[in-house]
Each structure stands twice: as structure tokens, then as C-alpha cells.
Amino acid sequence: GEYFVNYVKEHNDGKARVVELTNAVSTHCQERFVGLHEVIDAANADGCQIEILNKYDSQGNRETAYNAISAVVEPYDYVISDVDNGAMGAVSALQATGNTSVKVLSMGAYGQEPFGMLHNNDVNYLACLNVDAWVLAQFIFDGTISYFEGKDVPTQTNIDLFVVDNSNVEKFWSF
């Protein structure tokens, strides 16, 4: 959220219109927007004018995200998706219409596709939060072992997240 607000302050004089792509059935994806909205609300209280125009449930699905973004008629500056599949669908929809001005951010991404787009300075894909699948898998594996050994399994797991953009993507992926 802070990366986004700082970017809007620097590039849009603190003003932005945002379309959100959510995954309504995923609790942890919904939580990502709670944190984002807290940061946006604080920025707006401090003089920014960041408006959430609408929220579309992309279901973490590229095609649904593509269709949602293709149907937006009011002007907007940014698309924020909770997962990389939604972001990739948004990028595809924007590029199919030749739109190079709207920027897309993802609150969860990892791998060659999103990192390659950042490395190649894609005109629409701006940044993502690095959600390392290996780290998540390790927590799941450890939790499963603990469960079958009769040990307590944490109900919540926190991992380190890092904002990745074209300035630091090479720290997270080899090209």
C-alpha cells in the first residue's frame, strides 16, 4: 500500500482512480485489501485523493479479470489485484485495447511471468508483492507434519513480503 501511495504522490500529484480485482472466496486475499484500504484511507486523510471506483471479483482467474477490466467504461488510472492471475488478465485486457497509461499492481506474485514483465519494463505492469511459493509450501509441509504428530498447528502464518518492481526484480529472479 505504501509503495502505491508514494507512486501516486510522485506520478499523479496524489490523485488516482482505482479498480480492484478481488478473490471474494479467499479470506487471505480479502485481508490484503483491508491493509491496502487502511493505507489509502490514511493517505486520503493526509490530502491525497485516491478513489476506489469499483471492485470486481476476478476469482483469481485471468479470463474473469480480463472481462471485468474490458467492461470498465469510466476513466481509471490503476488496477490493483490481490493475485497475479488477476493482474495478468488486467494487463492482457489493457494491451488488447492499446492502453499503455493504466498501471497494474499485484498484491501477490511469484515466478518468471510477472518478474519477466517487470524486468522487461512492461508498459502496464508496475509492481507486485513477492509471495514466494517455496516459503508457503514449507509452512504447509511443516504444519502437516505437526498435525500428524499431534502438535499444535498455528492458525495464522506470517511471511516476509517484498515489493518488487523494475528497480529490484533481479534480486528475486535470475534472468
Please report, for each region that a protein language model flagged, where it lies by residue.
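Hinge/cleft segment of the Venus flytrap/periplasmic-binding protein
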Residues: 131-175
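Hydrophobic alpha-helical
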Residues: 36, 54-116
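Short beta-strand elements in bilobed, periplasmic/extracellular small-molecule ligand-binding domains
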Residues: 17-20, 37-62, 160
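Hydrophobic alpha-helical segments within soluble ligand-binding/sensing domains
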Residues: 1-16, 65-66, 87, 110-115, ...
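Extracytoplasmic "Venus flytrap"
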Residues: 21-31, 81-85, 133
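Rossmann-fold dehydrogenase core element
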Residues: 119-130
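Short, solvent-exposed amphipathic alpha-helices that sit
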Residues: 3, 28-49, 64, 89, ...
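Residues that mark the start of a beta-strand
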Residues: 15-18, 103
